[in-house]
Design a protein with these regions (language model features):
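N-terminal signal peptide c-region/cleavage motif recognized by signal peptidases
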Residues: 17-19
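Short, surface-exposed charged micro-motifs
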Residues: 33, 74, 139, 189, ...
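Short, surface-exposed coil-to-beta transition loops
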Residues: 253-255, 283-284, 449-451
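Conserved positions at the start
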Residues: 29-32, 70-72, 135-137, 185-188, ...
Length: 481
């Protein structure tokens, strides 16, 4: 394990250019804890003490405070307090596997708050040289069903174990005996969903920059103490595990999983990549949508700029301008007549052919059959100066080849305006949901508090309304034209 990395003098312009998948700012960290939100800000802690803070979940910088140094912390909120666990030595550091896991409390994670004060750490797990488990790499789970608190820990140098803690004190429950639940992984995390307990572990080689093969695997169980089986039924206690995420997006060494539930059906996963090739091989904090496929977690894809069809999940129609449909000439062949001449490709309809018939002012939008026409092609572009949200920057959505922008209105409708201005009602939040569809949300709706999303109120009618994950009206897909 190594300390948090910090780099000075990197310009914002450079970081924006590298921001397709990892966070911007200075997101340099190793072994990040599960992300916690406290008083409107986001926090994560890492190996070596300290950690990162973000005002919006997109731009990160140093400043989080965690005493004790050590390695591989985790955090959980219990009531109105935060419990932080971390490891002192162990993990083969300095050639020793003697270590301990400690827990401590704080009322707030904001180091500038007068209430900021960590309690004295309590030892809850330990190991000696020669033991078959390494007391390092803490993972915390507060069971949402019965309120019990669990700690997983361990590395490649033996078993992964689970032990029960007291959620009132953070101490180990007296007489509780650790249970072996996995081998051949480390940096474990426990989560619960829909009647299943999931054990996320980090598999592969660590701490070798661009050569690190770290990847995140998972098994699940009906019982928190196991057995944890992968999708093929292999026990993680015998080396099983299903892949969640590995190297991607020019980054290697995915490790130290964390889950963040934003809303019903909106989940994010955090991890580090041991080497971001676009940032000189630095270890960075990264986020991805967390998808659930047949009861198994898998990392989604970071949304990318481009030109798309925006398709409603309700019926499969596409978002389009309310303009007259202009027919194309040619290409009509009587199917019963023989082909007597070589066939030539048809050219698609181009913007210059139709734009002269469009209004110069605001144009409403509707949903209709997709015909890859200019009034149905939307270019989605990052707006880095507008900030962002957990995982991504805000985007502008314009008709391809124009500055005609999708915008929210004071009466909670959607229109297009002739010119993008950067107004908050023209900025959009795009988030992949756990089923692989997306929700599309304006940064602001003039005169409205709270969040509204783009939805299909009828097969052909888009509007803004309350988000409901259980309704296809709120879901969209992006397809390349």
């Amino acid at each position: 394990m190594s300390s948090i990395f910090k780099v000075a003098g990197v310009t914002a312009t450079l970081l924006v250019s590298l921001s397709a998948t990892a966070q911007i700012g200075e997101p340099f960290i190793h072994d990040p804890s599960t992300v916690m939100k406290c008083d409107g800000k986001y926090y994560t802690f890492g190996t070596g003490g300290g950690g990162l803070i973000s005002d919006d979940g997109w731009s990160w910088h140093g400043g989080a405070v965690r005493p004790g140094r050590g390695a591989a912390p985790d955090a959980v909120k219990i009531g109105d307090r935060y419990l932080v666990a971390y490891s002192a030595t162990g993990g083969g550091l300095g050639g020793s596997h003697k270590g301990s896991v400690l827990t401590m409390w704080n009322k707030t994670l904001d180091p500038s708050s007068p209430d900021f004060a960590f309690t004295e750490p309590i030892e809850v797990a330990w190991s000696e040289d020669g033991d078959d488990c390494d007391a390092i790499d803490a993972g915390l789970l507060l069971d949402p069903i019965d309120g019990r608190l669990w700690l997983s820990y361990g590395t490649y140098f033996g078993f992964i174990r689970i032990v029960e803690l007291d959620p009132a004190t953070g101490a180990r429950i007296e007489g509780n005996t650790p249970v072996d639940i996995a081998i051949d992984c480390e940096a474990t995390d426990l989560i619960y969903r829909d009647g299943w307990y999931y054990l996320l572990g980090t598999h592969g080689t660590c701490c070798d920059g661009p050569n690190s093969t770290y990847n995140i695997i998972v098994g699940r169980s009906r019982n928190v103490t196991g057995p944890y089986l992968d999708k093929l039924g292999r026990d993680m206690l015998k080396g099983g595990g299903k892949m969640v995420i590995a190297a991607r997006d020019n980054m290697t060494g995915a490790g130290h999983f964390g889950r963040y539930v934003e809303d019903e059906g909106v989940e994010k996963m955090s991890c580090h990549f041991e080497a971001d090739f676009n940032r000189g091989g630095m270890s960075v904090l990264a986020f991805y949508p967390l998808l659930w496929n047949d009861g198994w977690p898998v990392a989604g894809e970071a949304f990318r700029e481009g030109t798309y069809e925006i398709e409603s999940e309700r019926r499969g129609y596409a978002l389009e301008l309310c303009v007259d449909f202009q027919r194309m000439e040619g290409g009509k062949h009587r199917f019963w007549e023989p082909v007597t001449e070589p066939l030539q490709p048809l050219k698609t309809q181009t913007l210059d052919v139709v734009i002269g018939s469009w209004s110069d002012g605001d144009i409403n939008v509707r949903i209709g059959d997709y015909m890859f026409r200019p009034h149905q092609k939307w270019t989605i572009t990052e707006v880095p100066e507008a900030g962002g949200y957990l995982t991504s920057p805000y985007y502008k959505i314009t008709i391809e080849g124009t500055e005609r922008a999708l915008a929210a209105t004071p009466d909670a409708e959607v229109i297009t305006v002739p010119q993008y201005t950067g107004a908050p009602e023209q900025l959009w939040r795009i988030e992949q949901l756990v089923d692989g569809t997306y929700r599309i949300m304006p940064k602001e709706v003039p005169g409205h508090d709270g969040n509204l999303v783009l939805m299909s109120i009828a097969d052909s009618t888009p509007t803004l309304g309350e988000y409901d994950f259980n309704s296809d009206n709120c879901k969209w897909r992006f397809r390349k034209p």
